[in-house]
Amino acid sequence: MNESKPGGPPRIALVTGASRGIGRAAAIALAKSGAHVVALARTQGALEELDDEIRALRPTEPEATTLAPMDLRDFAAIDRLGEALYRRWGRLDVFVGNAGVLGLLTPLHHLYPKTWDDVMAVNVTANWRLIRSLDPLLRLSSAGRVAFMTSSAASQAQMRAYWGAYAASKAALDALARAYAAETVNTSNIRVMLINPGALRTRMRATAMPGEDPATLRAPEELSAKIVEICSPDWTETGKLYDFPSDRILSFRAPA
C-alpha cells in the first residue's frame, strides 16, 4: 500500500528510535513507500548509516531523509521539534513512536530511582511530550497517523516477575495512546494505534532474553509492512491494538 500518492507531495513521517531494530526497519519501509522520513535517535553514526541505505534505495532523491539526533530525555528539544517540522513542511503525516528502553530487570524494591525515572522518561513522558509538540502538525495533515510500539508485558494475565518498571511504562503508554485516540477521533483526521510486535530479533530482546536463540525469532523487517499499512491514509481504525504475533486487531475491553 503506497504511503505517498504518485505525483503528489511525499508524506512526512517521523520515526523515533530509528537507528536500529523496529525503528530502523519502519524508517526504511516508509521510505520505500515514498515518504520523507525524519529519523530520530540518539546515535548520529547509526542515523548516518540509515541515511546511506535509504539514499541507495532512492538514488534520484538525495533528500529522502532528515536526520534528527536527539535524546528523548531532552524534553526541551522535543518541544522545539514540532516548531522545526512546521517551519519546514507545515504539517506532519505520520508519527511512529518506537523508541523505548528496557531498564533493569530486577525486583521493584531493588530498582534504583534513576533507572525507574529513565524508563518512564523515555517510554511514557517523551511520548506525551511528542504528542504535545506534534499534535498541531498532525491536525494539519489530511490523514495524520500515529503508531506506538507497546508490549504484551503491559497486559499479560500472569505478570512477569522483575519486569515491573518496563511493564508499568508500557501500561501507561497504552492508556496515553488510547486517550489521544479518544480525543482526536471526532475532532480531526488523526488515527492512533498501538502495536504489539511480540518477540522479534532486536537488541532489546537479546538483553531481556540472553539465552534465547535469535535464529528462532522473526526479523523486524517482517513487521515493517504492517507499520506502513497502519500509517497509510487508507487506515481507519483508531484506539485499538494490532497484535503482530496473531495478526489481529484487538479492542480494549473492561473485565467481565
Question: Can you name each region flagged by the protein language model?
Answer:
Residues 33-49:
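Conserved glycine-rich Rossmann-like NAD(P)H-binding loop of the short-chain dehydrogenase/reductase
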Residues 139, 143-186:
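Catalytic loop of short-chain dehydrogenase/reductase
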Residues 106-108, 115-117:
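Substrate-binding pocket helix/loop in short-chain dehydrogenase/reductase
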Residues 98-105:
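Conserved NAD(P)H cofactor-binding loop of Rossmann-fold oxidoreductase domains
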Residues 190, 194-195, 202, 210-256:
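C-terminal helical subdomain
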Residues 45, 69-80, 113:
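The beta1-alpha1 cofactor-binding region of Rossmann-like NAD(H)/NADP(H)-dependent oxidoreductases
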Residues 19-21:
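Conserved glycine-rich cofactor-binding loop
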